[in-house]
Amino acid sequence: MDVEAKYLRMIQGMKRRGRKDWAVYILRCGDGSLYTGIAKDVRARVKQHSEGRGATYTRTRLPVKLLYQQEGLTRSKALIREAQIKAMPRSKKEEIILSEHCA
């Protein structure tokens, strides 16, 4: 592979890594619990959860309802935000759900 082709592949990889096409979301499960996750396509991911094809946690707690989503994040920022939300007490999660990012 010549130098120009290597450079082009490197640039394309950098563009993909910096994309802000990820979102963090919160679902309310059938038992009233809250589930937090990340996805590129939140609508499709919620559909998977609703059909019992999502996370093991939500499969046994159907139905699920989307309450919150925050879009425009890189994958790494979405993972960080997901971890932050998961570490919060339920009361703080409820505050976030009522914020400007409501679904």
Language-model features: where?
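GIY-YIG nuclease catalytic motif and its immediate N-terminal context
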Residues: 1-55, 59-72, 76-86, 90-103
